[in-house]
Amino acid sequence: MLKKSTNIKKGSIIFFEHTSKILKGNLLGDPHIRTFPVYIPWQYHSARNKNRKFPVLFDLAGFTGSGLGRVNWKNFEESVPERIDRLIHQQKLKPFIIVFPDCFTSLGGNQYINSSAIGRYADYLTLELIPHIDSELRSLASREHRGCLGKSSGGYGALIHGMKYTKFWGAIGSHSGDAYFDFVY
């Protein structure tokens, strides 16, 4: 088991339940009410930061993964929130909010695109979740302070969003993004 640092300030995970108009009635019959976690850095709740706004990063899970899975405990490595806490503590990162969207489908996931067969997940992220986060949290609500990253299918989604939805994203990261999904849909 990985020995984890206990002497650093930790952020918190809050859960949002969002009712999507865009995902309602999708052909797969997947839920349109989604619960997803959001990482909040400890500085967000600090009294001296009560008016401070924070950049936001959307973390897109890979195929068969979910936003909920991205915040889980890991036995031999740091979870995403643990890693972010450590890097903020070491001053290698500045504090920011991380959104872990729930875009899981009955097929095991998606590529965060709009699909007549699976659902309009690009629109769900850009037209519903971004405004929801910006209205509920003290976020820096502009593309210059918003990023999107992912691994595998999430990496593909991040690349597509970086190319097709540039008015929403100021930074993109893709780790092993799969490709050729546009030929499948």
Describe each model-derived feature in a short phrase.
Residues 1-185:
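Non-catalytic cap/lid and distal C-terminal segments of serine-dependent acyl enzymes
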